[in-house]
UniProtKB/Swiss-Prot annotation:
Signal peptide: none annotated. This is Phosphoribosyl-ATP pyrophosphatase. It comes from the Bacteria. Transmembrane segments: none annotated. One of its GO terms (molecular function) is phosphoribosyl-ATP diphosphatase activity. It comes from Burkholderia cenocepacia (strain HI2424).
Amino acid sequence: MTQSTEDTLLRLAAVIDSRKGGDPDQSYVSRLFHKGDDAVLKKIGEEATEVVLAAKDVRQGGAPSALVGEVADLWFHCLVMLSHFDLSPADVIAELERREGLSGIEEKALRKRREREENGG
């Protein structure tokens, strides 16, 4: 990820954050925030499903641009969700950086060990 990419995500997140106290009649994002957890999370599920369907379409000769568009929708709604739970893209980027260089198997083993320690085991 380039600095420009990270900057784009952070700028978009700032705009989303600014909608938290906005008028739900004037802003789609404000409306999602106003509706609460279930509306935000339902939107994530819908967008994730659309990503899966678009990916399957690409394998059948569909347009890759449709998949990119659906992923953009999912990322956008994930940014809304992060903001809704008082998190930011920087939190996700930090976690990805922490995992960088670890194999998926190693990362999963470390996560399980941490969970056991947190649960007193």
